[in-house]
């Protein structure tokens, strides 16, 4: 079996698998490979346990500006449309209601203004008053002793929307389709990359077991590990990483759909939301919390999981200055300490209950169950030159046949949009063709028309 490929993708999560499919379906590349360190695809950030299983299209994510929502909506549409085109309903993609709510006069005023801006972007977006929310999500309004909660509440959202996705199963489908299209493609599991070497006009991707695969182009979609790999080759040395891990709590099946809350604009992390679990029936997840930790993967034991690569990246004056500046803000400081408390046994559950009751007021301590093994690290990039936290996705394009992607949320939602960008770059670099018009025709006709 030849180990030489046109392109090798490092990382078998949903982003890497989407590019594997896109190159196979729409480009003239003949052989593409994925190398993945786990024994199965999509076992880390793309696992159904690691994320909220949400297609983040911007309609109920209150931290998105209208400009960002317009872009994210188109990205989300591609991922949704792929699943519907392939007939993956109720296996990979699920239909449910969803809404964002404002609680209290200040948040309600914000939600009213937001609706006026966003109803033009999202066709069919509906505004919900307190009575309508009670009809759709009775447990959001029901207070103590069977009496409605006293706060003013309004929201907006959809009564039905293809809004829930199992990104692990989507990853598997991408790979299955890609292998049908190009049987010479290859997937290498249990291949933990140790280093990447440039050898003339080819890259050698070398595993810890001394296996080697070769490619003219390497795309690194390795989540938290992308930046350490880049820095090992001399790229991205002006960047650091703030790993933020999210945890969830299970509650009984008290919500009919997704319920999101208003996010503090100062905080780069999602506000607490409720999501009926698509995999574990009869359970609803409340979360995430946000805890910084010196690990590139969440669910490893503490000592084994501490990352030497992370320490190399972050043990410098610039990173400490960024951290100091962030912690100097009272709201951010209180948020960080509060989330540290959430992780403590016994007391953490008591403290989290108050946040969870913003969504379901009647929740009791007995209703909350810490979701062990759920949640994952999202690498937030620190720009050491600008001395600030960079929100969202980060790409290092070397223009030398290797690109590094760091894709925290909404990276899974945007997987096909990111795959489009990367596939076009790879095809152009290798002098191959890419059928952009057919891509848009299949997955985003709206962009083709415009």
From Swiss-Prot:
Catalytic activity field: (S)-malate + a quinone = a quinol + oxaloacetate
InterPro entries linked: FAD/NAD-bd_sf, MQO
Catalytic activity, EC: 1.1.5.4
Keyword set, alphabetical order: Cell membrane, FAD, Flavoprotein, Membrane, Oxidoreductase, Tricarboxylic acid cycle
CC cofactor note: The FAD is tightly bound.
Compartments in which it is found: Cell membrane
Annotated GO CC locations: cytoplasm; plasma membrane
Record-level GO BP terms: tricarboxylic acid cycle
Co-factor requirement: FAD
One term of GO molecular function: L-malate dehydrogenase (quinone) activity
Domain of life (superkingdom): Bacteria
Pfam families xref list: Mqo
Membrane topology according to the record: Peripheral membrane protein
Broad class of the protein's primary localization: membrane
Pathway where this protein functions: Carbohydrate metabolism; tricarboxylic acid cycle; oxaloacetate from (S)-malate (quinone route): step 1/1
Keyword Ribonucleoprotein: no
Role, per record: Catalyzes oxidation of malate to oxaloacetate in the citric acid cycle. Donates electrons to quinones of the electron transfer chain.
Family: Belongs to the MQO family.
HAMAP family referenced in this protein's UniProt entry, alphabetically: MQO (MF_00212)
PANTHER family: L-2-HYDROXYGLUTARATE DEHYDROGENASE, MITOCHONDRIAL
Name of the protein described by the UniProt record: Malate:quinone oxidoreductase
Primary gene name: mqo
């Amino acid at each position: 079996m030849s180990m030489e490929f046109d392109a090798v993708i490092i990382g078998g999560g949903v982003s890497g698998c989407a590019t594997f499919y896109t190159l196979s379906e729409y480009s003239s590349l003949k052989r593409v490979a994925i190398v993945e360190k786990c024994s199965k695809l999509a076992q880390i950030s793309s696992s159904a346990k690691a994320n909220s299983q949400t297609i983040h299209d911007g309609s109920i994510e209150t931290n998105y500006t209208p400009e960002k929502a317009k872009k994210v909506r188109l990205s989300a549409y591609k991922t949704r449309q792929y699943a519907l085109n392939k007939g993956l309903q109720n296996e990979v993609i699920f239909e449910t209601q969803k809404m964002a709510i404002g609680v209290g006069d200040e948040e309600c005023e914000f939600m009213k203004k937001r609706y006026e801006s966003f109803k033009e972007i999202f066709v069919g977006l509906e505004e919900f008053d307190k009575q309508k929310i009670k009809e759709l999500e009775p447990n959001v309004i029901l207070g103590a002793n069977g009496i409605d909660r006293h706060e003013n509440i309004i929201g907006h959202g959809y009564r039905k929307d293809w809004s829930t996705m199992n990104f692990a199963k989507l990853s598997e489908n991408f790979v299955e389709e890609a292998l049908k299209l190009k049987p010479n493609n290859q997937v290498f599991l249990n291949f933990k990359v140790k280093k990447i070497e440039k050898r003339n006009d080819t890259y050698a991707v070398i595993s810890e077991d001394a296996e080697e695969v070769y490619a003219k182009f390497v795309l690194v979609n390795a989540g938290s590990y992308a930046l350490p790999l880049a820095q090992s080759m001399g790229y991205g040395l002006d960047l650091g990483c703030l790993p933020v891990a999210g945890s969830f709590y299970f509650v009984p099946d008290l919500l009919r759909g997704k319920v999101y809350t208003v996010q503090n604009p100062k905080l780069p992390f999602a506000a607490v939301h409720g999501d009926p679990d698509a995999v574990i029936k009869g359970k609803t997840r409340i979360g995430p919390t946000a805890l910084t930790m010196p690990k590139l993967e969440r669910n490893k034991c503490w000592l084994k999981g501490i990352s030497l690569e992370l320490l190399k990246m972050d043990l410098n004056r610039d990173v400490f200055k960024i951290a100091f500046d962030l912690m100097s803000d009272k709201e951010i400081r209180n948020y960080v300490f509060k989330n540290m408390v959430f992780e403590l046994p016994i007391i953490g559950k008591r403290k989290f209950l108050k946040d969870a009751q913003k969504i379901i007021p009647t929740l009791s301590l007995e209703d909350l169950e810490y979701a062990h093994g759920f949640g994952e690290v999202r690498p937030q990039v620190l720009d050491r030159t600008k001395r600030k936290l960079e929100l969202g996705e980060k790409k290092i394009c070397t223009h030398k046949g290797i690109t590094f992607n760091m894709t925290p949320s909404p990276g899974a939602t945007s997987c096909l949009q990111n795959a489009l960008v990367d596939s076009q770059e790879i095809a152009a670099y290798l002098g191959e063709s890419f059928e952009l018009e057919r891509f848009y025709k299949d997955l985003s006709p709206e962009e083709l028309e415009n």
